[in-house]
Amino acid sequence: FWGALFKTVAKVVAPFVPDIVKWVQEKV
């Protein structure tokens, strides 16, 4: 169950990862 949930979340979050990384780098 958790594996499937994680895969679904990863699919949804994947497009936003670059923006998140950029935001984190700006904060550091």
From Swiss-Prot:
* Entry keyword set: Antibiotic, Antimicrobial, Secreted
Q: Which GO terms describe its cellular component?
A: extracellular region
Methyltransferase listed as a keyword: no
Where is this protein localized, as stated in its record?
Secreted
Domain of life according to the entry:
Eukaryota
GO BP term (any one): defense response to bacterium
Q: In which tissues is it expressed?
A: Expressed by the venom gland.
Q: Please describe what this protein does.
A: Antimicrobial peptide active against Gram-negative bacterium E.coli MH1 (MIC=3.5 uM) and P.aeruginosa PAO1 (MIC=10 uM) and against Gram-positive bacterium A.globiformis VKM Ac-1112 (MIC=1.25 uM).
Which family does the record assign? Belongs to the ponericin-Q family.
The identity of this protein, by name, is M-ectatotoxin-Eb2c
Q: Source species, please? A: Ectatomma brunneum
